[in-house]
Amino acid sequence: MNLLSDSPLKIYFSGICGTATASLAILMKNRGHEVQGSDENIYPPMCDLLEQNQIRVDSGFHQSNLEPKPDLVVIGNALSRGNPEVEAILDLKLPYISMAELLKEHFIRGKKSLVVTGTHGKTTTTSMLAWVFETAAKNPGFMIGGIAENFGTSCRDAKGSFFITEGDEYDTAFFDKRSKFFHYLPEQLILNNLEFDHADIFNSLDEIKKAFRLMLRLIPKSGLIAANGDDLNVQAVLRAANSPIIRFGFGEPCDLSLIHISEPTRRTPISYAVFCLK
């Protein structure tokens, strides 16, 4: 059986209530697969979204949750060795995969992949980018680390040729310690900012920079990187890129400069900012 085919499968998500994992479970159910999962921390908004999509969530991690045996288990990155379901999956030799790898093979591969990265602002930027493509009638697929109010969901399959993903630098799974964004086949990428974060998996800012440098090397020469031109840490990792770069920000090195515009004389004063090509 080809576990990465679109043939209907019985798929079990261990650690289903994470934002990305719950979103992927919904996408897989919408593709016609039989989906259920388990978690210990079951709380809104993702548990509500799963319930709305009629996806059963078992409370707690138990070997009995895996009976009858599923065709495939998706293991969330919060689960590690010693977890009862992880140990059962290994003992029973069940096929398993990470959330990021499944997302890549079922939804991103074959599409034009746009990935939003950086320490802060990923969810907001991904939501805005998806909405821009939506209003341009591009019908993008997307995976956002939160529920976007404009869409009423955190994820959607692509009807058009684009898939937009929030690219997290956190690790993929206990069996794959690479950052999740390595899986997303980036062709065009936004890099918002870069500073030390995730001290539970990174020992220093230099380790985070290394992960971003490696990720930038995955972007083809025909791709594009839009990066914060004011962030010194971002500028440091951009040296690893082999793709065209557009810098945005306030400073002189930026190709797109942010200009603040204020019109206080209007009956209703407005203040906004726009990017202008130099």
Spans of features found by a protein language model:
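ATP-dependent carboxylate-amine ligase
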Residues: M1-M46, L50-V57, P68-V73, D91-L94, ...
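Short coil-to-beta-strand transition motifs
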Residues: E252-D255
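Glycine/charged-rich beta-loop-alpha catalytic/anionic-binding loops adjacent to active sites
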Residues: K112-L114, F250, R266
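Short, hydrophobic beta-strand segments that form beta-sheet elements in well-ordered domains
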Residues: V35-D39, D58, V73-I75, G141-M143, ...
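Histidine-centered active-site/metal-ligand motif
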Residues: Y12, H33, F61, H120-G121, ...
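Phosphate-binding loop of NTP-binding sites
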Residues: L4, L27-N30, E51, S64-P68, ...
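Single conserved hydrophobic/aromatic residue that forms the stacking wall/gate
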Residues: I259-K278
